[in-house]
């Protein structure tokens, strides 16, 4: 899910040529969910093989990995590990939303509303262990390296960029910045137009490059303050303070200096503030000295 910090970022539209020769750490779960959500039939059903097994994730993976490789861009997929207990609330809420979307999908099919059916179907996507294993097998066949993180894949990828193993993290989630990724790429190869649901309106989608240092400079805050700001808004690990969005949160963090003083001014309380900070500053990762990343010839 992630947190929406777009209004606070400095976004530079880029094209594939600017990424040629670069090594990108791909937020694997993030990208696979994109494929499972978007690669569907008109009625919302995912692609399946003759045995009824979902293949949307593999279709998307083969297409995108092959295309980016042909453009001289090296990918390293980083997979999430065991979620932290603080994320349980979010995961439970997602599960309930998917159940609701499943019911609404079925209802839309009954009345013949295919546009609504497809929209609701996209919200039911589930990434199974079998799909993850299949993805890793395909990556091995393609000669594309992958890393299994102990916990958050974005945190592992961010560290690999900081340590010079990779050049940027490719993800849709602005949480990547909270984990300290120096550079992130959004909308990787998604340039084009996208139709807004239930509207006869199309929006442009461009690849975006976001540099953490420029984000901090623009807002005149530190990395620790960015994390405190996110906690006030609400993250994957906490609900945040009602009525606090990016702009209001930024203002109060700059006025108060940190989350403790901001909460005091707001007369609000977040009990596990230090634990939440540690989720971004000290997340469990593998040392890059123990991570092997090598691009090989396809099998």
Where are these predicted regions, by residue range?
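Noncatalytic, basic helical substrate-engagement surface that gates or grips nucleic-acid strands
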Residues: 2-10, 14, 18-162, 182-184, ...
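Charged, glycine/proline-rich intrinsically disordered loops and linkers
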Residues: 104-118, 196-214
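Short amphipathic alpha-helical segments embedded in low-complexity Lys/Glu-rich regions
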Residues: 82-83, 152-156, 177-179, 247, ...
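Glycine-enriched alpha-helix->loop->beta-strand junction motifs that scaffold or abut catalytic
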Residues: 165-167
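Structured partner-binding subdomains within large eukaryotic complex subunits
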Residues: 176-178, 182-210
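Non-catalytic nucleic-acid-binding/docking modules located in mid-to-C-terminal regions
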Residues: 7-20, 24, 35, 74, ...
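Hydrophobic/aromatic ligand-binding patch that stacks against planar heteroaromatic rings
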Residues: 67, 160, 176, 229, ...
């Amino acid at each position: 899910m992630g947190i929406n910090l777009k209004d606070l970022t400095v976004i530079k539209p880029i094209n594939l040529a600017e990424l040629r020769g670069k090594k990108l750490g791909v937020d694997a779960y993030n990208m696979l969910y994109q494929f499972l959500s978007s690669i569907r039939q008109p009625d919302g059903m995912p692609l399946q093989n003759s045995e009824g097994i979902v293949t949307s994730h593999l279709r998307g993976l083969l297409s995108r990995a092959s295309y980016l490789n042909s453009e001289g861009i090296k990918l390293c997929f980083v997979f999430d590990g065991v979620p932290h207990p603080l994320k349980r609330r979010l995961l439970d809420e997602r599960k309930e939303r998917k159940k609701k979307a499943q019911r609404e999908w079925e209802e839309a099919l009954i009345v013949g509303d295919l546009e609504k059916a497809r929209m609701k179907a996209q919200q039911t996507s589930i990434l199974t262990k079998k799909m993850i294993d299949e993805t890793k097998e395909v990556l091995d066949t393609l000669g594309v390296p992958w890393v299994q993180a102990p916990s958050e894949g974005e945190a592992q990828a961010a560290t690999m960029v900081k340590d010079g193993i990779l050049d940027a993290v490719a993800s849709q989630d602005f949480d990547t910045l909270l984990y300290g990724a120096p550079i992130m790429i959004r909308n990787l190869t998604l340039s084009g137009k996208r139709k807004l649901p239930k509207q006869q309106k199309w929006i442009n989608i461009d690849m975006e490059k976001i540099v953490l240092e420029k984000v901090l400079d623009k807002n005149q805050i530190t990395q620790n303050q960015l994390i405190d700001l996110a906690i006030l808004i609400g993250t994957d690990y906490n609900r945040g303070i009602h009525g606090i969005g990016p702009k209001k949160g930024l203002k109060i963090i700059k006025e108060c200096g940190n989350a403790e003083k901001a909460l005091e001014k707001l007369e609000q309380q977040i009990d596990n503030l230090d634990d939440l900070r540690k989720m971004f500053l000290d997340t469990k990762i593998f040392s890059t000295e123990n991570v092997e990343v090598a691009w090989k010839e396809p099998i």
